[in-house]
Amino acid sequence: MALKTFKPITPSLRQLVIVDRSNLYKGKPVKQLTEGKSSSGGRNNNGRVTVRFRGGGHKQTYRIIDFKRRKLDMPAKVERIEYDPNRTSFIALIRYADDELSYIIAPQKLAVGDEVISGQQVDVKPGNAMALANMPVGTIVHNIEMKIGKGAAMVRSAGTYAQVVGRDQGYVIVRLNSGEQRLIHGQCFATVGAVSNPDHMNASIGKAGRSRWLGRRPHNRGVTMNPVDHPHGGGEGRTSGGRHPVTPWGKPTKGKKTRTNKSTDKFIVTSRHKSKKKG
């Protein structure tokens, strides 16, 4: 998909750059594969704000995506590629040989009419899903499971991919986009190829209103607030905050390590931080 620019007849159109979605299906999603979705506005079940600067936006219908791909050894044909407001990638509607319909994350180079299949050992081509242990070293993958049968958890955003770089005693070493190398069980499934819509990162929203359509409210800095609202707030006139940068809850930000899950440290072969320092 290409990027789309506009004749600058207004200030917002001058900087607006969006992904050209003219090739996508223009109708409604399959009703049996959708469900309602209520907007939380960034609030939890107590009604308290847990994610700031969220709210409003266009109403969305949730599309049920098959992240498990456990309908093994049954070919499916790609019926159409669709837009999904709930994620940055595009989705593909596939029809299995027994006429069952399903949505999957669309990888790059997947076209209408293509055939996809999932199984323990299948052809290495975009859209096919199989166990990591059976993939050749060097394969580009996405939709990676972290626990066997739980469904894809990693590498699902637009344009992302990981690479199988080695094997180690029933585990597979996968290099992620961040540079991190991680051990994942060989029986975890992954899908061949990179995720669709790589141009998403080059889009420019163009105006504040488009951000509001996406459900994003204005993001204001702590240093512009009052002392009651943020540790950086207050002061006479403009101030620098007067302390090292912290979150609204007083925890150090900008570089402070926050990872505490020591039980899974053994699965990280190379930290993403170390790989950056080497570069």
UniProtKB/Swiss-Prot annotation:
PROSITE patterns: RIBOSOMAL_L2. Pfam families: Ribosomal_L2, Ribosomal_L2_C. Keywords: Ribonucleoprotein, Ribosomal protein, RNA-binding, rRNA-binding. Residues 209-220 have a biased composition (Basic residues). One of its GO terms (molecular function) is structural constituent of ribosome. InterPro entries: NA-bd_OB-fold, Rib_uL2_dom2, Ribosomal_uL2, Ribosomal_uL2_bac/org-type, Ribosomal_uL2_C, Ribosomal_uL2_CS, Ribosomal_uL2_dom3, Ribosomal_uL2_RNA-bd_dom. SUPFAM superfamilies: Nucleic acid-binding proteins, Translation proteins SH3-like domain. It comes from the Bacteria. One of its GO terms (biological process) is cytoplasmic translation. Gene3D superfamilies: 2.30.30.30, Nucleic acid-binding proteins (2.40.50.140), Ribosomal protein L2, domain 3 (4.10.950.10). Residues 29-49, 202-279 are annotated as: Disordered. Residues 36-49 have a biased composition (Low complexity). GO terms for cellular component: large ribosomal subunit. One of the primary rRNA binding proteins. Required for association of the 30S and 50S subunits to form the 70S ribosome, for tRNA binding and peptide bond formation. It has been suggested to have peptidyltransferase activity; this is somewhat controversial. Makes several contacts with the 16S rRNA in the 70S ribosome. Belongs to the universal ribosomal protein uL2 family. Part of the 50S ribosomal subunit. Forms a bridge to the 30S subunit in the 70S ribosome. This is Large ribosomal subunit protein uL2. The lineage of its organism: Bacteria, Pseudomonadati, Pseudomonadota, Alphaproteobacteria, Hyphomicrobiales.
